[in-house]
């Protein structure tokens, strides 16, 4: 297997629930190394830029509103087959379809307020990591 990096967001609803530590424990229990992390409150411009590929879709404005509604935690996770393993840990985008024991089954409130984001491919992970982190902020270990 190949060691990969993936990008992850703990979204405002999970931060508000004080679930950061529990989610980090799940990352580490699943074998991920957290090699970069920061908490921030997205501006509208940052959220629109990050989700630019969804502009024009019916859910875009609501997504931007939600993602700017409170602080988020962004992190870079490293591990074998990290992109797919992180997606498996997150569970289905719609929490109603998420398997028990996944992050979305445990922490999501709705399809939009689904607790976490994760990259869908290595290429998008690289782009998303670069959106929030400089190389100097990433600490391989």
From Swiss-Prot:
Please report the organism this UniProt entry assigns to the protein.
Answer: Photorhabdus laumondii subsp. laumondii (strain DSM 15139 / CIP 105565 / TT01)
Which family is this protein grouped under? Belongs to the NDK family.
Q: What is this protein called?
A: Nucleoside diphosphate kinase
Indicate the residues that form the catalytic site: 117 (pros-phosphohistidine intermediate)
Cofactor (UniProt): Mg(2+)
Described purpose of this protein according to its UniProt entry: Major role in the synthesis of nucleoside triphosphates other than ATP. The ATP gamma phosphate is transferred to the NDP beta phosphate via a ping-pong mechanism, using a phosphorylated active-site intermediate.
Task: Please name the gene that encodes this protein.
Answer: ndk
| Molecular-function GO terms, alphabetical | ATP binding; metal ion binding; nucleoside diphosphate kinase activity
SUPFAM superfamilies referenced in this protein's UniProt entry, alphabetically: Nucleoside diphosphate kinase, NDK (SSF54919)
